[in-house]
Each structure stands twice: as structure tokens, then as C-alpha cells.
Amino acid sequence: VGRVIHRTEVKQMTEIHFDIETKSSVDLAKQGLYKYAESPDFDVLLLSYAVDNGKVQAIDLANGEVIPAFLIDALTNPNVRKIAHNASFERVCMSVYLRKKRLLGNADGWYSDGKFLTPVGWYCTMIQAAEAGLPMSLKAVGEALHLKEQKLSEGKELIQFFCVPKKDGTFNKPSDFPERWETFKNYNIRDVQVEMQIYQQLAKLPLSQYEMGHYITDQMINDYGICIDTQLVQNAIAMNAKFREQALQRAKEITGLDNPNSPLQVLGWLEEQGVKSASLDKEAVAELLRTTDGSVKEMLLLRQQLSKSSVKKYEAMQKVAASDDRARGLIQFYGATKTGRFSSKLIQVQNLPRNAISDLPIARELVKEGNYEAVELLYDSVPDVLSQ
């Protein structure tokens, strides 16, 4: 593709800027990068690159063009710096693509039993921008730096058109829309041009070796992921559904309300019982529980437990877990741009409830077995057990 690069020139290569466009039926935002790339219909459509600050060239993989051998060598050579904006996306996606196509290149470029390209040798201008106090998105960084060439605005619509499946599950074919496809190729090329300008403008503020070491560690943590006990997750979600069904049925029996989950209906019922309250938030319910008894107190306790019966984290685990039951890509390096602290994605592993159950291993095993009756018998609150 483009000019021929001779082997002597390849040996002198020190840097390569690149950007890819991909497709997958998995929702990237909700299920994460690793699950996105693991999808059977995942593919790399376009790859644009520039060698050592040279001219940007596009490889139209969707229309049968192939990645040159020298580029595969570069991508799998830890001594060649691969520069991209949000480089983890390019690295993980290219890891999957090269493995699928059996284009493995240099063995030194792989780790984790050949699952991923090593993060050593990868450089992320998104992280570089964040450390400099700039926004993280390519578009926002370009605008903040007043770059000569900005990210093309048509890209968002074209990504939706070519990279996200239609309602029937199929993808639009580039060959059916040649003009739009050419625009998409130009968009891909422009992204590399914008990234190169960012890299050049921030040359005086490079990531230090110290920070690069942390970045590599972060990438390795994300690649290895954490093991998810999918049986426990599945049964926890089922237990929560059973608890909610029983609790709502009991609440209907107590109040006679059509929807005892409605704050307005419950407040009206409480007033009929001679109990006035402006709210049913956590603090208000706790205060009412100290001054009520009988059916009112039972209803408030049910209300309190229903408010705790959230299994969003379990549902997130279910969505993110890969085929090997590991959840990957849970940490965003330099996610808090003002402090440089990491942030979490998808499951929010840094924000799990504190454990207060003394025999937690037993409770965990009962949930894993799906033994709802035992959990209900042995513990005060099913939702509280599930939250821990």
C-alpha cells in the first residue's frame, strides 16, 4: 500500500503512528474493550499509519488490502515505539486481529501466553495529554491545542454506519457505499494526522520513564483482569429477583396498593395510617422506623430492603466477563486528570461495599449454590448478603 518501504529503511524505523477503525456487535461502552474485541464478528476495517513522522497511509482491510510484513514486524517489536491516542484500544484490537489472522510476527512482542501484544513499546498520547492537564478525547485535545488539522466531525455518524450492526444484526458493506467509505478512510487518516500533531506539540512534556512504568503495569493488570465466579453471579441475580418478587407481594398484602414500589403511593398510604413524611429517602425511612410499629414498621422495613436490592454490579460482571470468565479493562490509567489517580470502569472495583458478615465464605457458598431458603433463614437480610 502506497510507497515501497525497503528493509534497510525498516531497520531504521523507531516510531510508528497509527489508528484503526473496527466493527463489533458488542457494545463497547457497556461491555468494555476486551469483550468488544472478543466478539466473533469483530474485525479491523481500516488501519492508517505513518512511519517516523512520514506521510499517513491507509490500509483498506475491509476491501482486501493486507498489512505489510514490515508493519507486522513493527507492531510486534517492543523496540519500535507504537504511538496512538487511547493506545490500549489499538493494542488490544490488534492483538486479537493478528492472532485471528495468524500474523504473529516477533515472539518478543507477545506475552500472557500469546494472548496480547506486550504494552512495552506502546505510547499513548491520550495519557500524555491528561498528564499535561488537557482533555482526554482526541477531538477535545485538538481543539484545546488549536491544531491546524482537527478531527473530522463526520466520523461519529460514519462509525455508527459502518462499525455498529443494523437492527437485523448485519453490517453495512463498504462496497455498497463507496463514497461514504472514502470519507471514512479520510476520517481514519485525519485521526492519525491529529494524533501526530498532539505528539509533536507535547514533545516538551513527554511521559517520564517512571510514569511509563506505571502505565505498562496498568495495561498488564487490565490484560490479566480478575476472575468472575459466573455461577455465583448468576445465582445472586436470581436470588435478588426472588426476593423482590416476594417482598413486593408482601407489601401489596400489607398496603393494598397496586404498586407498593411507588413513593407517592406509599406516602399516601402512610398518611392514611396517621404517619406523615415528606420523603422516603434513606434517612427518612430510618427515622420513621424508630417511631412506628406493626404493619407500618413491616412495610417500612420492606421498603428499606427493596431500596438495597440492587444487583447492578453483578449484572455488570455478567456483561463484562469474557469466555474464560475473566473481566478485563476495569481500570482507567490517569482517569482523574487533576490528580493523576486511576479511575474504574464497568464494574467499579474500587467501590465495593465493606464486608461485615463474619462468616462470609459460608454465605458466598450458599449464594453460589442458589440456596435461597438457607440465606433467608441464616441472615437478617438477603439484599445485604448479596451486596457483600
Regions found by a protein language model. Give the residues of each.
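Cytochrome P450 core scaffold surrounding the K-helix E-X-X-R motif
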Residues: 25-29, 58-61
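Conserved "right-hand" nucleotidyltransferase catalytic core of DNA-directed polymerases
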Residues: 5, 9-28, 39, 46-48, ...
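Short, conserved, GDST-rich strand-edge loop motifs in beta-rich repeat architectures
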Residues: 32-35
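Active-site-proximal helix-loop-helix substrate-binding element of RNase H-like nuclease domains
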Residues: 42-203, 358-359, 366, 370-372
